Amino acid sequence: MTSVAERLGLPAATPLVIVTADGLGWAHAANIGAERAMSDGAASAAGLMVPAPWARAASARHRGADVGVMLTVNAEHDLYRWGPITHAPSLLDGDGGFPRTAEDVWDHADIDEVRRECRAQVERAILWGFDVTHLSAHLDTLMLRPEFFDVVLELAVDYGLPMRLPTGGSEDSAGFPFRRLALDEGVSIPDVVVSSRTSLRGQLERVVFELGPGVTEIVVRPAIDTAELRAQSTDWADRVDDLDSICDPQFARLLERAGAHQIGWRALRELQRRS
């Protein structure tokens, strides 16, 4: 089988790297962080949380960028909340926002309401002018149960979009072969996904020098340091550190020394649609 690198005109063994700035729309600080990560740093794509409070503002600045939709059915913070953009009572908790945990969604969400909500999030991003390049799932909630995964896979097929799927043993813990199911439907997925709920700074050098053939996605959550960010989230320092790390020229030099070639999700999408 021809490798992705070969289909892009590169040697078969070339490590391909996507650096995705997740959390676009999550907050104003995240919008500016994603913008800087793509313009001044090594990020080649971003992920948009359509229901989040600053998503609409992001559309005015990022319409032409390589932006995917982070399908969102959770609002995990205690004080900073958002909710469905459709009528979806089963996707509300007692505070009137999305449930805080994946387990709450898995236990109580009506699958038809989830299907309508997720499709509406993609359609709204398109309505706002985004050329949607990929799908992912906030907190991976929709990827780790088969009935919810089917919703995302259906969207990926319908819209011709590649998708992020967890790696590193996640299939074993989920109990079903979600990666094979996606590939069987012709959906492109990265071979390795590197992400963390804390700063990736300490891992980046190791990750780069362990790159192998295929597509590796490095997921960061960049944000600028503001008083509002500090009030919104207990992990604000990790987000600021992600921005600093990805904008550090040393990271670009690491990729170059490792022989890696940076791509965006749009490249995977176009290959998928031509298949």
Locations of the language-model features?
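Active-site gating loops and adjacent loop-to-helix segments of metal-dependent hydrolytic enzymes
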Residues: 78-106, 234-237
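Catalytic domains of cell-wall/extracellular-matrix polysaccharide-remodeling enzymes
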Residues: 111, 119-188, 193-205, 209
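N-terminal pre-catalytic segment of deacetylase/amide-hydrolase enzymes
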Residues: 1-18
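Structural preference for beta-strand elements that scaffold enzyme active sites
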Residues: 16-18, 43-47, 64-70, 132-136, ...
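Active-site beta-loop-alpha junctions enriched in small/polar residues
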Residues: 22-24, 49-53, 70-74, 138-140, ...
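A short alpha/beta connector and helix-capping loop motif
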Residues: 28-53
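Acidic (Asp/Glu)-rich catalytic clusters
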Residues: 7-9, 34-40, 55-66, 83-93, ...
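C-terminal domain-boundary segment and adjacent tail
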Residues: 163-166, 232-275
